[in-house]
Amino acid sequence: MQLEIQVALNFIISYLYNKLPRRRVNIFGEELERLLKKKYEGHWYPEKPYKGSGFRCIHIGEKVDPVIEQASKESGLDIDDVRGNLPQDLSVWIDPFEVSYQIGEKGPVKVLYVDDNNENGCELDKEIKNSFNPEAQVFMPISDPASSVSSSPSPPFGHSAAVSPTFMPRSTQPLTFTTATFAATKFGSTKMKNSGRSNKVARTSPINLGLNVNDLLKQKAISSSMHSLYGLGLGSQQQPQQQQQPAQPPPPPPPPQQQQQQKTSALSPNAKEFIFPNMQGQGSSTNGMFPGDSPLNLSPLQYSNAFDVFAAYGGLNEKSFVDGLNFSLNNMQYSNQQFQPVMAN
């Protein structure tokens, strides 16, 4: 009896694995085994295998067998979840020396287990013998019941005492950790935690990105020079507005030393790096370096009241003057005129 019950149990719970909690499914199998053995006492006839077959049949459909309902209740599973994961209209016959099942009212009857020593066993072909549940990963057909060893948690019954159940029983030993092993796991999980710092990319720098520092300095010098030029254009646009205002008496001139300090402080720190290569002969031309229809609307530069940039910052041979320039100074032509200082507005 125990062998046939185990074959039927393995077939039923194979549909529940990986869909319901495994521990509860194992408890469900143990409770169902206990209830079936209790039900079949006095209704097991090895001399007449088909006697009482309808009583021993387990049916799961619109009406679920009371044994399945009781096992679900004892294991903590919802009966709707159990019925939803099992095939519709499933019937399992557990008879002496044979276990068979049928899915649907008109489905074919397939054999799960048959005793080869029985005289009717030779009539079954290989296709019927191998008609196991394809989803039963834990279901293993038992070929030789006499050679198997009983490992069932319940006591054996009768001549079918040798059985090897395939569902895992409840573990009696609790899972324990030491302080070191628990520290290496994720909190609330037995999986080892991974070091996330090793996977992070190190902070990059301009050297790691393949950029040249000299190129960055040149770009910075050019951008600052254009900023100074834009300030000069705004100053030229504000001149007509200042002319429209009524004339006011000029303030008294400051002392000469204070004038020199104001000119020095008002000079842009990047003015020494800004050079106009096409200034000669373009004092009043509007098609020169800065045409009148340009977005900046820069007027021609006025060279009155100017001072010498080279006198203030040294000659061309000094390194501080030529730093940041991206072209050769030997090919440039300079006029003898003085340069207009860049004044802050």
From Swiss-Prot:
Low complexity biased stretches: 144-160, 237-246
Effect recorded for residue 95 to A: Impairs interaction with CNOT7 and CNOT8
Tissue occurrence: Ubiquitous.
Disulfide bonds: none
Residue ranges of the region described as Disordered: 144-171, 231-267
Similarity section: Belongs to the BTG family.
PANTHER family linked to this entry: PROTEIN TOB1, TRANSDUCER OF ERBB2 TOB
Subunit structure: Interacts with ERBB2. Interacts with CNOT7. Interacts with CPEB3 (via C-terminal RNA-binding region); recruits CNOT7 to CPEB3 to form a ternary complex required for mRNA deadenylation and decay. Interacts with CNOT8. Interacts with CPEB4.
Protein name: Protein Tob1
